[in-house]
Every structure is written in C-alpha cells, then in structure tokens.
C-alpha cells in the first residue's frame, strides 16, 4: 500500500489558499481515478483505491497544517506501514509557481506540516513539493501562503494538477524523473533547475512581517496562528 498525503488547512474558507495546494492535488487525483468516496478516519478525510496495481490511500489531515503528522502517523500505524510507503504533497515557497520537485527524505525547509510529519512518521518518505513562488519580501510571506490563488495562476495551476492526476501511477511506481518531466512539459518549467537555497521557516519569515487581512480571530485556525506567530506587538 502507498499513502498519498496532501497537506493543507481544513475548512471552505481556506480551500483556495496557496498553502492548500496539497489538498488540491489529492482532489485532482481523486476525481481522475476510481477511488472510494471521501470518508472520515484518522482525524482526516480519506479515500482508497488502486493505482498501477497498488492499493493507495489518499489522506487529507483535518488537524490544521502544523499537526498533520498526528493524522498521517496514525494511518501508517494502523496499516503497519513505514515512511517508505508515504508520499507527502505540499506547497513550496522557494520554487517558482508551477515548478515541482520530488525527493526521498531531507529537511523540512521550514514547512510546519513537514515538521509534524517528520516528528510522527520518520524522515525517510518521499516529498513532492509544488512551487507557489515567494512574494519577494519576508513581511508578505504569511499573507502569501494563506492567500488564495489568483485567476492568472490557473494558467499553470490547472495543468500542474491535471497532469499530476493523469500520471499519478508514476508517483506510485516511483518513476519520479519521468513524472517531473511530464509536469515540466505541462507547465513550461524546466525539470533540471538548480536546487533552491534553504529557506527559513514560515514562522521566522513571517514573525516580523505584516499580518494578512481578514485572519480569523476565533476558532482553531486563530489558535494555531497565535501559537505560530504570537501576539501582535505595538
């Protein structure tokens, strides 16, 4: 069995956020292939099916981003799987929009969802990073990742997600180079770009920045942001 874990924040108000591209990727795979309807288990939305002759579990943690590992780790333990059977799909600030990279293991790059997966699942899993671009100024990072994709983003976002879904069997078989070439052709990016420089964590990048407009003041998301960024200074 292979577990494909898309990372994001739950709730319709966050569905279009750049931070939720992992959820979007799993939704595209779910639409394209014959998976079961979404159901709730492991503090997540899950669906099961078969790709490339392999049983596949799609999982979208509903714990909010920085607790994603609790959900995914529970699923791995239930099915007696190791990190080698896990593929995480998530947003990457330090890749150009539409650019994709995949690797086995590595650091979290400041991504809070990946920090949580590392803590609960181990390090030796495959990581598919989907570029959302950097806003260019650390003070705008929080607003960028928690902001919605714009209409112009559809020019690369739709081909990226549809091509990933169409070739999800390559992801399951571990044909990573072939998949990266497919995605690069679909989005007009290069499959052999230089590796991005290590990024500071989202927390450090955004702590001294301007808070984005219309952030929730109550509820689970508000509590998560308070823990991440602390009280606003005068």
Swiss-Prot record:
Oligomeric and partner information: Monomer.
UniProt keyword annotations, A-Z: Cytoplasm, Hydrolase, RNA-binding, tRNA-binding
HAMAP family: Pept_tRNA_hydro_bact
Marked site positions, Discriminates between blocked and unblocked aminoacyl-tRNA: 9
Function text: Hydrolyzes ribosome-free peptidyl-tRNAs (with 1 or more amino acids incorporated), which drop off the ribosome during protein synthesis, or as a result of ribosome stalling.
Entry annotation: catalytic residues: 19 (proton acceptor)
Family: Belongs to the PTH family.
UniProt-recorded name of the protein: Peptidyl-tRNA hydrolase
Molecular function per GO: peptidyl-tRNA hydrolase activity; tRNA binding
CDD domains listed in its UniProt record: PTH (cd00462)
Enzyme Commission no: 3.1.1.29
Entry-linked Gene3D superfamilies: Peptidyl-tRNA hydrolase
């Amino acid at each position: 069995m292979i577990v494909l874990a898309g990372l994001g924040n739950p709730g319709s108000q966050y569905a279009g956020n750049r931070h939720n591209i992992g959820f979007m990727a799993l939704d595209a795979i779910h639409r394209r292939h014959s998976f079961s309807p979404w159901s709730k288990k492991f503090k997540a939305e899950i669906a099961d099916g078969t790709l490339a002759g392999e049983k596949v579990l799609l999982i979208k943690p509903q714990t909010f981003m920085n607790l994603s590992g609790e959900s995914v780790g529970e699923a791995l333990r239930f099915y007696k799987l190791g990190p080698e059977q896990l593929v995480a799909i998530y947003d990457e600030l330090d890749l150009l929009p539409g650019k994709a990279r995949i690797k086995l293991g590595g650091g979290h790059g400041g991504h809070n969802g990946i920090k949580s997966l590392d803590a609960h699942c181990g390090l030796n899993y495959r990581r598919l990073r989907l570029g959302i671009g950097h806003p260019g100024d650390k003070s705008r990072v929080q607003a960028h990742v928690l902001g919605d994709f714009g209409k112009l983003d559809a020019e690369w976002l739709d081909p990226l997600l549809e091509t990933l879904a169409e070739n999800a069997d390559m992801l399951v078989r571990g044909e990573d180079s072939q998949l990266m070439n497919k995605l690069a052709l679909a989005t007009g990016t290069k499959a052999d770009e230089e590796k991005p420089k290590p990024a500071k964590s989202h927390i450090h990048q955004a702590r001294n920045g301007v808070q984005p407009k219309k952030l929730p003041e109550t509820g689970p998301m508000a509590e998560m942001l308070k823990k991440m960024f602390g009280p606003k200074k005068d």
